[in-house]
Amino acid sequence: MIQILTGTALLLAVLALFTLFSYKAPHGMKAMGALANAACASFLVEAFHASLFGTQMGITFLQGVGDASGSLGGVAAGILVPLALGVSPAYAVLVGLTVSGYGILPGFIAGYLVSFVVKFLEKKVPAGLDLIVIILVAAPITRGIAMVMDPVVKSTLLQIGTVLIQAQETSPIIMGLILGGLITVVATAPLSSMALTSIIGLTGVPMGIGALAVFGSAFMNYVFFEKMKLGTKKDSIAVAIEPLTQADLISANPIPVYVTNFIGGGLSGIIVAMMGITVSTPGLATQIAGFAVSVAENGMRGFIAAVACAVVSIIAGYIGYFIFKNYKITTADEIRGTQEEVAA
């Protein structure tokens, strides 16, 4: 139990760190938005093509498409974050390519930090020499940062994963509550539930919990975003399909979103654990692919569990609204300057 509490506290600390970064770090919100775009460009493609069309339907070509995209999350983050911070496209690609082979979070951290180095060099080095200097200085620094951060990120994810494994050894209700709650929270955070469940090799009932809890969260987040008026209808649909598309908005409202997701995910997890739904493929903690594989491997029992998870998740969305309806929120307009852009 102590280990479970320790791991849970670690997860909360990581989530708090991302929120602090969004608010206090220079261009934090822009960087988080770029991270969300990188996750969509890599993990979402991987979820559909590799996990669904490749693994489940046996389409080898699409398996390759998904695997290729999923393996380049770090490169995507390393390119998109500098672009968001105002680095010229050529230098942004240069930075991103140097983190090839590393995950999305090491790529994000390296891309963010080196963006300031590149902008400084662009300003101070005479035109014509800046390309050579940036190649000689920024490229090795970028890879060095990614190399240092990679074991830190992996050890953090593995520690969180240990919580999920430890919970499996307790009662089904506790296992479902903790796994469902934590994986659903991770699904809304920049950690990526797909990456987490892949790294720790989650299979069986724990993976079934992750798959259907995240599936249910699509309905819950849509209801919650709509009722709280966090963004437009488009934002609500986007967060239902892939929460990472709204990473900046979620990081700006961490307590309402994470608490609501833990409630819905925990309820879904209990249902899945009690029904014994299993998934044999790790990394399927994603809305559409998780649902499809759960039903494919468990038949009508999996479908019934999915419907039940959707129902309790919708209820959780309303519960979250009633809890936080008077809570001061930060809207998409405030974060992204939508109203100002329209007025201009």
Question: Whereabouts are the PLM-identified features?
Answer:
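Pore-lining transmembrane helices
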Residues: 2-342
